[in-house]
Amino acid sequence: MIEIKDNFLDKEDFDKIKEVYNSPNIPWAMGDILYDDEINSEVSILDNLQFINPVYSMNQPVSQLFEYWIPLLKKTKAVALYSIKINLNPRTPKIYEHGLHTDTGFMCKTGVFYINSNDGYTSFEDGTKVESVENRFVSFNSDMKHSGTSCTNQKYRLVMNINYFEAKFINLPHK
């Protein structure tokens, strides 16, 4: 099931995130969006590019910016984290769907938090499209194939991608 929650964070918490990630001081790493064999055939391998800011990996925060995400973590049902990263996809002349994929090879929850509004979206194998609206959080089971896109009406599309465990995935009692 796909769950969409608008105005997910309080305005103050969201404004802090937006300010930090729209500053020129973020340490971005350049990387592929998907493996070349996963990329949508209409997307040139030359356009298989995004900028990434890892926040949480290998069971620990890997960025001083982790603290900005604590309010979001408190609003999810996360009991354990697998990964958090921020993706910056540059504007393209037309919207490209990058290609259907899953983020992990095991069952957990995947979430996308939209940091800016733009004409990009997240699409799912069943045809569902979730528009990129700032301060929106969409969550779904990690076995659901999904695709991000580029955008055409902003300089970039900026999202946070999180993979996490809820109690039901690790046999903990629900509260």
PLM ranges: what are they?
Residues 74-93:
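A short glycine-rich, His/Asp/Glu-containing loop-to-beta-strand
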Residues 94-99, 106, 114-133:
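A short beta-strand-loop-beta hairpin characteristic of the jelly-roll/cupin
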Residues 111-113, 154-170:
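A short hydrophobic beta-strand segment most commonly corresponding to one strand
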Residues 99-100, 145-153:
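Short beta-strand His + acidic residue motifs that chelate non-heme Fe in jelly-roll/DSBH
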Residues 91, 130-147:
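Conserved metal-binding segment of the jelly-roll/cupin
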Residues 1-79:
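Non-heme Fe(II)/2-oxoglutarate
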Residues 3, 123, 162-175:
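Double-stranded beta-helix
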